[in-house]
């Protein structure tokens, strides 16, 4: 009876995909298989009560699952720490403790297009879920000479050294030579990977459809407004740099003599994050977030300015009305996540913490109010400066209208009018929906929809059911099976405005035109968004990516973000002595982001190339083992085949004339430096000129080449054999 209890954990917006395949639904293509599994959301791990997807969380036995499938597992790549009795668990630790470690023995299957962002520790943290955070469990099962911790440490060290090489030396082959054999053995044991490039090159896609051709990306840099003598980006940035944002750090103003009263705020007590650290983290995020919001839209920036201004003014009012210490400040009132983008909302600053109150009598509220009043004055000035930028004078919005007009009048695929517009912020999505829906309806008779983290579905079609599944089905009817799901319905949506809540896992390839209305700070997000339409089986011959960039040089833009982070970091060190309060994503490698964002201005980068380094596609041999097992099922006589087999195939551009040798070392004990991954077999590719085209240390490349040369061929090429 093992493996009967299965849990699928996925982002909430992807639950319908999973529910379809287990339910008795007309659009379930595998209904006869009668799959049985529970579907819950990543966010449910932090919940103790209530209903979720028809399951009562109060009574759920989290520890009774034989298998847990984690969709979009990269959301758990930052890991977690356990220390002390009062350690507060983040989502990662909840999963580890409630599901994997508790109850019956649980196997873990993780699905992700981006398991590694820009460091190998991302992969290690995800793998730790499978071995319950106990490395000794994995070490016993691996055929390696080193522990898993040492393997990843050495791999990251090799990668760091390789990344500093000159560009012409920083090749995949060079990195493969420096990585330890045990690292390959580890990945080969636990990963199976496929990429777009790999499928296109080595697989026959005639049965499942092709990938569409990517047109060169369009990069646009509209100015802020067409108003004469109006404020520009640099004017706003200078004002933003003057903000202290101490509204987010009240605990820094607790008087030293009163600190003992608030020991929970100022000391770790085993927690990985103190309340002071959490406040500083939110303050730093908000300082950077103001830049992000401005780059997204004037409307989004204005709303955030107004919210912070109201928060400050309300707090100043509370201080002024303070009498005899009977007034307390509730910190949770000033730590809401609604102003932040999808990634920032998932940091521990918002998911970890408890209600804490500070008595104003215990604060140096005079100094605090002085700083608050300075910020209030500058925010009011900002508010006045952008007040005149209405939609009519919003150059970025008007540029978007021009794009839509051109796309409709000159479609890149015959008759296809569909457009997806992505933004990082729901406020920008609301602003775009209000204006784009009116423009598209009045000028072209097109229907528009919106999906955000808080809006499951909103559309201009009267009486259309406003839920995620219906909206996506009406927007991408072929890929979503509308003819089965909504038979007889003529409702169709042509423009979809969305946040990153649907940037993962959705098949929307009926659409051929995707606009990034704001460029996400994490370059991987940009490619994930484009992946909604850049999918195998697309009905479109061509697809187009459009990116809106800030109205300034990219280096200047990235340096600006660096200056803001540095300024906030200095203030953190001054107040707390701690310079490591922000999450790994936000620390980021600015050079990595700079390089990738520059590439994205000129080309559409494959997601496996986004690390400027290596894809796990370059490492694993698992797929060849699967090919071999399948071949042996069909050809049982392979065991009696004579030695010395050979054949002849035509050369190609990637495989010039020569010989690929597959040899066997008769001495099994000899494997120099333990570097040959397929010992005792050795492969080498020698060109017609006698040069080594590929040596035995890169069997993955040789096996890929052989597969490509032999694909679709059952007999030797007679012309070449004569």
Q: What residue ranges belong to the model's regions?
A:
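Conserved Helicase C-terminal RecA-like lobe
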Residues: 1-4, 209-227, 244, 249-490
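Inter-lobe coupling linker of SF2 helicases/translocases
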Residues: 37-68, 72-115, 122, 132-334, ...
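Catalytic acidic motif of RecA-like/P-loop NTPases
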Residues: 74-81, 114-116, 295, 426-427, ...
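Conserved RecA-like P-loop NTPase helicase motor core
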Residues: 392, 437, 441-556
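Conserved helix-turn-beta segment of the N-terminal RecA-like "Helicase ATP-binding" lobe
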Residues: 4, 13-37, 130-134, 435-444
């Amino acid at each position: 009876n093992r493996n009967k209890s299965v849990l699928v954990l996925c982002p909430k917006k992807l639950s319908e995909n999973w529910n379809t395949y287990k339910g008795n639904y007309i659009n379930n293509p595998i209904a006869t298989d009668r799959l049985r599994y529970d579907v819950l959301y990543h966010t449910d791990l932090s919940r103790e009560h209530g209903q979720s997807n028809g399951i009562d969380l109060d009574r759920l036995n989290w520890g009774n699952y034989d298998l847990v499938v984690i969709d979009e597992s990269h959301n758990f790549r930052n890991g977690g720490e356990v220390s002390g009795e009062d350690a507060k668990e983040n989502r990662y630790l909840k999963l580890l403790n409630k599901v994997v470690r508790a109850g019956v023995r649980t196997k873990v299957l993780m699905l992700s297009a981006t398991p590694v962002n820009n460091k190998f520790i991302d992969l290690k943290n995800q793998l730790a879920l499978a071995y319950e955070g106990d490395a000794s469990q994995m070490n016993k099962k691996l055929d390696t000479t080193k522990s898993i911790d040492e393997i990843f440490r050495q791999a990251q060290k090799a990668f760091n050294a390789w990344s500093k090489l000159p560009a012409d030396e920083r090749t995949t082959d060079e990195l493969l030579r420096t990585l330890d054999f045990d690292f390959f053995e580890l990945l080969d044991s636990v990963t199976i990977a496929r990429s777009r490039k790999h499928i296109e090159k080595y697989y026959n896609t005639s049965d499942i459809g092709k990938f569409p051709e990517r047109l060169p990306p369009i990069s646009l840099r509209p100015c802020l407004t067409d108003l004469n003598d109006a404020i520009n980006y640099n004017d706003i940035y200078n004002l933003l740099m003057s903000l202290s944002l101490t509204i987010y750090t009240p605990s820094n103003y607790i008087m030293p003599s009163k600190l003992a009263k608030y020991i929970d705020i100022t000391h770790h007590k085993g927690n990985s994050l103190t309340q002071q650290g959490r406040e500083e983290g939110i303050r730093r995020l908000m300082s950077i977030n103001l830049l992000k919001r401005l780059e997204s839209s004037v409307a989004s920036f204005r709303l955030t300015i107004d919210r912070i201004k109201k928060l400050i003014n309300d707090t100043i009012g509370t201080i002024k009305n303070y009498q005899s210490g009977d007034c307390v400040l509730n910190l949770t009132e000033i730590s809401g996540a609604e102003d932040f983008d999808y990634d920032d909302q998932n940091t521990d600053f918002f998911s970890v913490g408890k209600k804490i109150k500070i008595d104003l009598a215990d604060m140096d509220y005079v100094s605090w109010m002085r700083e608050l009043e300075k910020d209030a004055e500058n925010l009011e000035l900002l508010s006045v400066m952008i007040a005149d930028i209405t939609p009519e004078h919003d150059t970025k919005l008007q540029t978007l209208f021009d794009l839509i007009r051109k796309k409709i009048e000159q479609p890149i695929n015959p008759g296809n009018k569909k457009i997806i517009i992505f933004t990082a912020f729901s406020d920008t999505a609301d602003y775009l929906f209000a204006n784009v829906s009116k423009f598209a309806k009045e000028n072209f008779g097109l229907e528009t929809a919106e999906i955000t983290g808080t809006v499951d579905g909103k559309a201009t079609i009267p009486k259309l059911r406003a839920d995620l599944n219906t909206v996506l089905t009406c927007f991408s009817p072929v890929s979503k099976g509308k003819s089965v799901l909504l038979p007889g319905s003529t409702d169709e949506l042509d423009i979809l405005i969305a946040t990153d809540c649907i940037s993962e896992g959705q098949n929307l390839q009926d659409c051929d035109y995707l606009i990034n209305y704001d460029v996400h700070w994490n370059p991987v997000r940009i490619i994930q968004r484009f992946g909604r339409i850049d999918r195998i089986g697309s009905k479109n011959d061509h697809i187009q990516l459009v990116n809106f960039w800030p109205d300034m040089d990219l280096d200047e833009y990235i340096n600006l973000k660096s200056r803001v982070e540095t300024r906030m970091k200095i203030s953190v060190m001054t107040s707390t002595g701690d310079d490591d309060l922000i999450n790994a994503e936000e620390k980021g490698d600015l050079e990595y982001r700079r390089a990738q964002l520059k590439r994205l201005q000129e080309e559409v980068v494959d997601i496996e190339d986004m690390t400027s380094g290596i894809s796990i596609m370059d490492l694993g041999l698992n797929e060849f083992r699967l090919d071999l097992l399948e071949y042996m099922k069909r050809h049982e006589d392979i065991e009696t085949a004579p030695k010395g087999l050979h054949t002849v195939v035509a050369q190609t551009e990637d495989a010039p004339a020569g010989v690929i040798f597959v040899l066997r070392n008769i001495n099994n004990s000899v494997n120099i430096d333990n570097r040959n991954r397929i010992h005792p077999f050795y492969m080498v590719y020698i060109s017609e000129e006698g040069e080594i085209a590929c040596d035995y240390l890169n069997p993955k490349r040789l096996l890929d080449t052989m597969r490509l040369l032999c694909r679709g061929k059952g007999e030797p090429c007679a012309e070449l054999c004569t």
